[in-house]
Amino acid sequence: MNNFFLLVSTWPVTVKPRGLGTSKNLTGQYDLQLSNKSLALVRKDTKEPMIELELISVRRCGHTDCFFYMELGRSAVTGAGELWIQVDDQIIAQNMHEAILG
């Protein structure tokens, strides 16, 4: 079995103070990194990974305007809840949604 991770995409994002952003103290600016198995929020200032979420823990996701959101299940390291992420424009939010679903 092959256990390596392949980085697919990286987006500059801002986690908003809503849902898990507040309850897990995740609000702030990050790079959201998508690999073939997970999503990682990497702090802009320290370049340190804050959390890594397995893709199988994402129950559903979507986008509206300049926001991308994910509903995470109980198996996520954060526990169940929503994560709201702001990006620079609507097209980026749509691209994130399509890439993560793919």
Label each residue range with its predicted role:
Residues M1-E52, I56-F67, E71-G102:
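N-terminal recruitment modules of adaptor/scaffold proteins
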